[in-house]
């Protein structure tokens, strides 16, 4: 067979699922007639349309391209509309073609014609398929078969019997594309069919060639050799096409393939939709029936006889047992498979037992149906309580914190609830309340996160002190607005030489206002609940002195929370409060005094000292005399420190 090439992609686009191959070949041949030729995107769009149209296959029995074109959305991308128009024109032109005149017999030739000169070539009758237009409008040229071409053709006809419509449409398309010679057709037959089918085809072809040579073929010269030899000449296009037509006609006498299932074995499933069952029948008949065999009577008969009982009852009730296929599809279109009926197995109910329950000691029920829980076999291994299992031990459940009062809930800086307390390092078992962050001594805790309660009946106004760096600080009443992107200040707060820039502000109603200016000078705003001022690099200036608004740029630096209480009360600013219980990490470190050399006599415990020397020393105190008392001051012990820190007490 020559050099073997690797298997490549199929040169013929594959049809969508559910569409017969010979119908798909009609779409392909119509697409090849377009100028410029179709692209892969056009075939993708065509497949998408056909997949949607196959859900209502009424346009296929018989096939109606005009009805399919009406289902196409307006302005659909690709050349799908052009392909359908070609099919519609061809479908209307096929019945109007006159029958070709019978070929003239050699006995009716004029007496003055020279038998050595062949008669002029007459174009043979085109097959009942769409012609394929090759690139640039040139006629097809002969191309020898390649292994990848033969493999692609065999893959297309692998499920079809020789002589079936799908088989013949694929072979016709391949013949029109490659324009093969007699030798090429013989190679194709040996590659596609078995030896028995090839032998039967050869016998049928010989009889057709003998009949054609006797009848007379346009362009055939008996002195130049048999028709098979003259068809191998690439220059004899007319004779080669005649031979190709005879080669295709010889498939009509071939038997069907024995591997195809019988038509009677294709049955509708219990839950299979009716149109899917009819489509399976249609594809099976296309793949197995010889070309020219009427398919509609067989399809109508099998569509009723092989349907399930429910669809047969619907068709009988509407009188569509042998109606056109479109009426049968409409009759069963609304049918849906019923759910499988569940058979309930009725079991006799056992009488209640007379014996007492092993769990509660009462009669009338079994222990598995007892309402009393099963007692544990022993005490709980965690708390030694014999009344519950280990999985129900209270120690395994997290402690539910008590709800905080309403006032405490407003203080957002209170310690967070964590499951485990914080242990201090060598702190004698002391614990510290968990906090969100460490409060520094030099930082005011009231400036961290304020909660501002507002009255719903009043506007959220607040007094603020504004310092514009060009004039003295002034106190104004500003509006808190979380919907304003920038802070707005009246122009009266700025001096006359303040540089201002023109800008436009888009209001909430969509109107643009131009009486606002933009300043790039830093502005300091002091709020009553914040000790450090807010620094704004720029803000809007109202030239009409109507608005003083604190926007999101200032509120974001405060990190404040606006709170709307339920009860009406005057607005109160709640500052941040420190926790009521402070841990040792919040206190300053105790003083450390060097104790070396250590006085063993002075480091005795205080309870061993007598009061008499102290009274005598205090009563006989002389000016400038210092009495030193050593008291034990406990401090957190450091690693490796076993001494006691003592501090002098000056009286």
Curated annotation (Swiss-Prot):
Q: Cite the active-site annotation.
A: 481
Enumerate the Gene Ontology biological process terms: proteolysis; symbiont-mediated suppression of host gene expression; viral translational frameshifting
Q: Which residues carry this modification: Phosphoserine?
A: 105
> SUPFAM superfamilies from the entry?
Acid proteases, Retroviral matrix proteins, Retrovirus capsid dimerization domain-like, Retrovirus capsid protein, N-terminal core domain, Retrovirus zinc finger-like domains
Q: Name one GO cellular component term.
A: viral nucleocapsid
Task: Please give the positions of the paired cysteines in each disulfide bond.
Answer: none
Q: Where is this motif: PPXY motif?
A: 118-121
Q: What is its EC number?
A: 3.4.23.-
Pfam families (alphabetical)? Gag_p19, Gag_p24, Gag_p24_C, RVP, zf-CCHC
Residue ranges, annotated region (Disordered): 93-143, 632-651
Protein name, as recorded: Gag-Pro polyprotein
What organism does the record attribute this protein to? Human T-cell leukemia virus 1 (isolate Melanesia mel5 subtype C) (HTLV-1)
Q: Which gene encodes it?
A: gag-pro
């Amino acid at each position: 067979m020559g050099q073997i090439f690797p298997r490549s992609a199929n040169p013929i686009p594959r049809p969508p699922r559910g569409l017969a191959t010979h119908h798909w070949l009609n779409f392909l041949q119509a697409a090849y007639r377009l100028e410029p030729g179709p692209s892969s995107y056009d075939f993708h769009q065509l497949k998408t349309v056909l997949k949607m149209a196959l859900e209502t296959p009424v346009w296929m029995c018989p096939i109606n391209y005009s009805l399919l074109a009406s289902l196409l959305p307006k302005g659909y991308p690709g050349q799908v509309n052009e392909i359908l128009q070609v099919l519609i024109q061809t479908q209307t032109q096929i019945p109007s073609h006159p029958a070709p005149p019978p070929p003239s017999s050699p006995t009716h030739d004029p007496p003055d014609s020279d038998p050595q000169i062949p008669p002029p070539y007459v174009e043979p009758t085109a097959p009942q398929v769409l012609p394929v237009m090759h690139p640039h409008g040139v006629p097809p040229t002969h191309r020898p078969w390649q292994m990848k071409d033969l493999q692609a053709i065999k893959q297309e006809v692998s499920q079809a019997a020789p002589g079936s419509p799908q088989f013949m449409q694929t072979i016709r398309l391949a013949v029109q594309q490659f324009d093969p010679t007699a030798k090429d057709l013989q190679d194709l037959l040996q590659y596609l069919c078995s030896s028995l089918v090839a032998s039967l085809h050869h016998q049928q072809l010989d009889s057709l060639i003998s009949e054609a040579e006797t009848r007379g073929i346009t362009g055939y010269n008996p002195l130049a050799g048999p028709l098979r030899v003259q068809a191998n000449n690439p220059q004899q296009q007319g004779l080669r096409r005649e031979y190709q037509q005879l080669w295709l006609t010889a498939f009509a006498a071939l038997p069907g393939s024995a591997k195809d299932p019988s038509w009677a074995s294709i049955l509708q499933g219990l839950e299979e939709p009716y149109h899917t069952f009819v489509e399976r029948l249609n594809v099976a008949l296309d793949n197995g029936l010889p070309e020219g065999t009427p398919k509609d009577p067989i399809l109508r008969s099998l569509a009723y006889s092989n349907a399930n009982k429910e669809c047969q009852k619907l068709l009988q009730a509407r009188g569509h047992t042998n109606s056109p296929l479109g009426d049968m599809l409409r009759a069963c279109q609304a049918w849906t498979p019923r759910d499988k009926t569940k058979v309930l197995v009725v079991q006799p109910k056992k009488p209640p037992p007379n014996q007492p329950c092993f769990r509660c000691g009462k009669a009338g029920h079994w222990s598995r149906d007892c309402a009393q829980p099963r007692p544990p076999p022993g005490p709980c291994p965690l708390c030694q309580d014999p009344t519950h299992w280990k999985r129900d031990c209270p120690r395994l459940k997290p402690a539910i914190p008590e709800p905080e009062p309403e006032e405490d809930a407003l203080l957002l800086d209170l310690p967070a609830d964590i499951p485990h307390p914080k242990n201090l390092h060598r702190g004698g078992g002391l614990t510290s309340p968990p906090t969100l962050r460490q409060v520094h001594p030099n930082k005011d805790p009231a400036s961290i996160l304020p909660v501002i309660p507002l009255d719903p009946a009043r506007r959220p106004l607040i007094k603020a002190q504004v310092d514009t760096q060009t004039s003295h600080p002034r106190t104004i009443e500003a509006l808190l607005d979380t919907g304003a992107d920038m802070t707005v200040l009246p122009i009266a707060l700025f001096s006359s030489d303040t540089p201002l820039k023109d800008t436009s502000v888009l209001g909430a109603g969509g109107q643009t206002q131009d009486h606002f200016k933009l300043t790039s000078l830093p502005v300091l705003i002091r709020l009553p609940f914040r000790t450090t001022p807010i620094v704004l690099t720029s803000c809007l200036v109202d030239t009409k002195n109507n608005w003083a608004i604190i926007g999101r740029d200032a509120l974001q630096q405060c990190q404040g929370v606006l709170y709307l209480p339920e009860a009406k009360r005057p607005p109160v600013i709640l500052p941040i409060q420190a926790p009521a219980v402070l841990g040792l990490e919040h206190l300053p470190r105790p003083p450390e005094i060097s104790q070396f050399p250590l006085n063993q006599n002075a480091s005795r415990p205080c309870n061993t000292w007598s009061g008499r020397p102290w009274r005598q020393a205090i009563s006989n105190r002389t000016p400038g005399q210092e009495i030193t008392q050593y008291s034990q001051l406990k401090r957190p012990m450091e690693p490796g420190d076993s001494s006691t820190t003592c501090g002098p007490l000056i009286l």
